[in-house]
């Protein structure tokens, strides 16, 4: 069993978060995603933004964004009530005001946002992963159909009506998925600027989609 589940909490960015077997253990790649999202928001949108985190799990992304961008309004969704219980406990623990929504992807979302961020399940069912992950962490949060691309297409094909005109969509991705996700993004947002960025191991790990933002900094 992973030590984080035994201890019951984990440090993420500046927060300490509760974790159990209903949520994925937050990875440092996801800390890096949050770091980049914060930078892009501050430089291109300003701090009074509305953010939606899809598939929030422990709440690590949503809570850190709220912590670092205190003027933002942050909503976070998950299909798992057990995950939302953990996320709510983390909001309470860190005194952060995030609105949690039970929703299968975008189904129960009613607002519009400047930023949509997601670290969805992206492992293909036939991909080999480490036993400690496969045997302990929630498969609901790990695996996805369509070679791991299912959630990216679901989000991108439906996102437009939940976005304000000027917006950023940010994803964590599997290292071989960058060009496929870029292709899907341009299918639904043909005028967007799409950036694929690498993690600390020099692997494709993040996709950022910018709409109506001309001079991206």
Predicted segments with their positions:
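Conserved AdoMet
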Residues: 1-40
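Short loop/edge segments at beta-strand edges and connector loops
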Residues: 7, 102-103, 173, 198
């Amino acid at each position: 069993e992973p030590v984080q589940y035994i201890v019951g909490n984990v440090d993420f960015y500046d927060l300490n978060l509760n974790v159990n077997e209903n949520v994925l253990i937050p990875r440092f790649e996801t800390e890096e995603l949050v770091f980049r999202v914060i930078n892009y928001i501050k430089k291109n949108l300003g701090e009074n933004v509305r953010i939606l985190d899809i598939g929030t799990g422990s709440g690590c992304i949503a809570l850190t964004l709220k912590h670092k961008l205190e003027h933002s309004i942050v909503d976070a969704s998950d299909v798992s009530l057990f995950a939302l219980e953990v996320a709510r406990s983390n909001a309470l623990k860190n005194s952060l005001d995030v609105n949690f929504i039970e929703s299968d992807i975008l189904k129960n979302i009613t607002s519009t946002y400047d930023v949509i961020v997601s670290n969805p399940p992206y492992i293909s069912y036939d991909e080999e992963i480490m036993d400690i992950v496969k045997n302990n962490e929630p498969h609901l949060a790990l695996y996805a159909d369509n070679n791991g691309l299912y959630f990216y297409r679901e989000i991108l094909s439906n996102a437009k009506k939940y976005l304000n005109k000027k917006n950023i969509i940010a994803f964590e991705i599997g290292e071989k998925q960058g060009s496929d996700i870029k292709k899907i993004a341009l299918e639904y947002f043909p005028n967007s600027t799409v950036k694929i960025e690498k993690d600390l191991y020099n692997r494709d790990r993040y996709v950022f989609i910018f709409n109506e933002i001309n001079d991206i900094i």
